[in-house]
A protein has these predicted regions:
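Outer-membrane beta-barrel translocator domains and adjoining extracellular loop/strand segments
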Residues: 76-82, 217-219, 267, 282-290, ...
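Transmembrane beta-strands of outer-membrane beta-barrel pores
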Residues: 70-74, 97, 276-282, 308-312, ...
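A glycine-/polar-enriched beta->alpha junction
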Residues: 30-40, 47-62, 90-108, 118-125, ...
């Protein structure tokens, strides 16, 4: 409790929340979708881009303005004691009849908004992939720590039994030292596994904004693999749906449209103008003449404004050339995106197949390692195998179990990588993986592998009562037989 209180205080100050119950993959993603700042930022950029279309369209619509003026004039010298006031109001209307630059600007913004929409879709898929990867990395770290803890317990039992057998003269001190060495090695591995789990949990928190005391773990019994579609079918689908490729195509279209927009600098413009106005003049003062009579005047005007650029110092031609170079660059980027999409699809396809093969291989490796360990333990009990053989077999078994677990998680992540490469990754894919999950499991290292102070103390004190204890008879004979290095 003393360790938990500072954590809770830190979370409350940091603005992070802690889930009150175990969450599965789909629930974790749904929480991330609502709070992930990267996705929300991309959504805001997309909305701003679409809103800017309205701004780009506005110059093509009628422009209506209302003006009003008030002027007071006070004379001096010859016009002394003469003053006047003028009040006027006007209403102006301007309508573009032909201005290709404004139409091109609207088209450019529409294409820009389309690119931003694809960027948002990419952010959605990235969040799905990042959430699933972080989630499975936590489960993988839990499994690694669990197997490391199980390996530690197994080696501890060997160390304890070997120490007892040495104390009664059944084994040599080297057996105890070998067991102790393996135990110390697995303790170092446990420290690393605990740290990896803490970091994995923190990475998931960074994606979702939440800490999860427990998560739904992988249901190994229900887990199964499926081979992907033929790679040619995947490549064909990626050609039309890969988001990076789609964004590059839209960028090329945008660059092509920019050339057309630059060329409008040579084109004429034609605007319609219309206005109506009213003016009220009032005169006063002791010396106001008879000619300065009060009057109210009004006027209506309609006109056309035509403009044809003849020469602008070469600026328009330069802008066209710049746009053409930008189009070449966008075309090369499209080719690069195309190659990258092919490479990503093929790599993801290969990774899925490799994961499936690895799962099958490690399943058999676990079975073989377990059989080997059983045989080594039986051989050690009758003296045909050494403690080193038993310890090596134990390490091999738990390494195979860890590799099998890692292969399962890699398979699921690689499945999502294929979907992402195709541009079809969505929430339904997470639901499919979510069906592979089962019981809840704690994410704290102290829950996965509780520290046992008594066991640690026993292991530290697991030293032979006498380092000079008599070597067992069988070992003495072996020593005497090998005392002469040249003897045969």
């Amino acid at each position: 409790m003393n360790k938990l209180l500072p954590l809770l205080i830190g979370l409350s100050l940091g603005g992070f929340s802690v889930a009150s119950q175990a969450e599965n993959l789909l629930q974790v993603y749904q929480q991330a979708r609502l709070s992930n700042p990267d996705l929300r930022s991309s959504a805001a950029d997309r909305d701003a881009a679409f809103e800017k279309i309205n701004e780009s369209r506005s110059p093509l619509l009628p422009q209506l303005g209302l003006g009003a003026d008030y002027t007071y004039n006070s004379g001096y010298r010859d016009a002394r004691d003469t003053n006047s006031t003028t009040k006027s109001a006007s209403l102006q209307l301007t309508q573009t009849i032909f201005d290709m630059s404004k139409w091109r600007a609207l088209t450019l913004q529409e294409k820009t908004a389309g690119i931003q929409d694809v960027t948002y879709q990419t952010a959605q898929q990235t969040l799905i992939l990042n959430t699933a990867t972080a989630y499975f990395n936590v489960l993988n770290a839990i499994d690694t720590l669990s197997y490391t803890e199980a390996q530690k317990q197994s080696i501890y039992r060997e160390l304890d039994q070997t120490t007892q057998r040495f104390n009664v003269g059944l084994v040599a001190i080297t057996d105890v030292q070998n067991a102790r060495s393996q135990y110390d090695s697995v303790l170092a591995s446990e420290v690393s596994a605990r740290n990896d789990l803490d970091n994995a949990v923190e990475t998931l928190r960074q994606v979702t904004g939440n800490y999860y005391p427990s998560l739904a773990s992988l249901n190994v019994d229900a887990f199964k693999t499926e081979k992907p579609q033929p790679v040619n079918a995947l490549l064909k689908e990626a050609e039309s749906r890969n988001l990076s490729l789609l964004s590059a195509r839209l960028s090329q279209d945008l660059a092509r449209e920019q050339i057309r927009s630059s060329e409008t600098g040579h084109m004429p413009t034609l605007d319609l103008t219309a206005s109506t106005g009213l003016s009220n003049n009032r005169y006063g003062g002791d010396r106001a003449s008879a000619n300065n009579t009060d009057n109210i005047t009004g006027s209506n005007q309609v006109g056309l404004s035509f403009n044809l650029p003849l020469y602008s110092g070469g600026a328009v031609s330069s802008q066209v050339k710049q746009a053409q170079y930008a189009f070449v660059a966008a075309s090369e980027q499209l080719e690069s995106a195309h190659r990258s999409a092919i490479q990503t699809v093929r790599s993801s396809f290969n990774n899925v197949n490799a994961s499936i093969s690895s799962i099958n291989a490690y399943k058999q490796a676990v079975i073989s390692a377990q059989s080997s360990l059983d045989a080594m333990e039986a051989g050690y009990s009758v003296g045909t195998r050494t403690i080193v053989d038993v310890l090596d077999a134990t390490t091999t078994l738990y390494n195979a179990k860890q590799q099998l677990a890692n292969a399962r998680y890699s398979y699921m992540i690689n499945q999502l990588n294929i979907k992402s490469a195709l541009g079809t990754l969505n929430e339904q894919d997470l639901q499919t993986l979510n069906n592979h999950l089962g019981k809840d499991i704690g994410t704290s290292p102290d829950i996965v592998a509780p520290e046992n102070a008594q066991q640690a103390a026993n292991a530290d004190s697991a030293e032979p009562r006498s380092a000079s204890k008599t070597t067992p008879v069988s070992n003495k004979s072996a020593t005497r037989a090998n005392s002469n290095p040249f003897g045969q």
